Amino acid sequence: MASIIFSAKDIFEQEFGREVRGYNKVEVDEFLDDVIKDYETYAALVKSLRQEIADLKEELTRKPKPSPVQAEPLEAAITSSMTNFDILKRLNRLEKEVFGKQILDNSDF
């Protein structure tokens, strides 16, 4: 991971040599002020994210690890729902068979 070369204070205290045809000092200072604000914002964001990572890691260590026993009720529920679905399909076929014949018998009148 790359290390940070400049801090906000380093940027603020940086001095530049002066030449006759140099940059506008006020513009450079304003730009560097904005860069300092960005550095401070990024530093605060990094600190906040590191704290959040630490909190989440701590929360993860406090939670109990899931055991294989917990998977069994889920498998039972899936099997049960498949069984219920099969029963409903069978009931549907039987109803069609019974009520379908009644409809055909009633249409003969």
Curated annotation (Swiss-Prot):
What HAMAP family does this protein map onto?
A: GpsB
Where this protein primarily resides, as one coarse class?
A: cytoplasm
Give a short account of what the protein does: Divisome component that associates with the complex late in its assembly, after the Z-ring is formed, and is dependent on DivIC and PBP2B for its recruitment to the divisome. Together with EzrA, is a key component of the system that regulates PBP1 localization during cell cycle progression. Its main role could be the removal of PBP1 from the cell pole after pole maturation is completed. Also contributes to the recruitment of PBP1 to the division complex. Not essential for septum formation.
One Gene Ontology biological process: cell division
Q: Which UniProt keywords apply?
A: Cell cycle, Cell division, Cell shape, Coiled coil, Cytoplasm
Residues in a coiled coil are 36-63
For this entry, the protein name equals Cell cycle protein GpsB
- Can you list the GO cellular component terms from the UniProt entry? cytoplasm
Q: Which organism is it from?
A: Streptococcus pneumoniae (strain ATCC BAA-255 / R6)
